[in-house]
From Swiss-Prot:
SUPFAM superfamilies: L28p-like. One of its GO terms (biological process) is translation. Keywords: Ribonucleoprotein, Ribosomal protein. The keyword Transferase does not apply. Belongs to the bacterial ribosomal protein bL28 family. GO terms for cellular component: ribonucleoprotein complex; ribosome. This is Large ribosomal subunit protein bL28.
Length: 89
């Protein structure tokens, strides 16, 4: 399965992991300095969830992001699926 949410379109993002050293200025030091930078990926918080669809009258097993789960709580499953289909997700 891909790491893309089918309802919100969230997917992994790119970024950097920074290595720092030194003593913070709050602790009477000279400050923190960046000594290295490593590429990394930020993954969306994905969960596998069984959701009841009232239109189809059955459970749907979806791998969705937690933000999509909050959206389903707010709007309802059918509205969120209709919105995703209209956006082409």
């Amino acid at each position: 399965m891909s790491r893309k949410c089918p309802l919100t379109g969230k997917r992994p993002r790119r970024g950097n992991s920074y290595t720092i050293r030194g003593i913070a200025k709050k602790k009477k030091g000279i400050g923190l300095k960046v000594t290295g930078k490593t590429p990394r990926r930020f993954f969306p918080n994905m969960i596998t969830k069984r959701l009841w669809s009232t239109e189809e009258n059955k459970f749907l097993k979806l791998k969705i992001s937690t933000s999509a789960l909050r959206l389903i709580d707010k709007l309802g499953l059918e509205k969120v699926i209709a919105r995703a289909k209209s956006k082409g997700l």
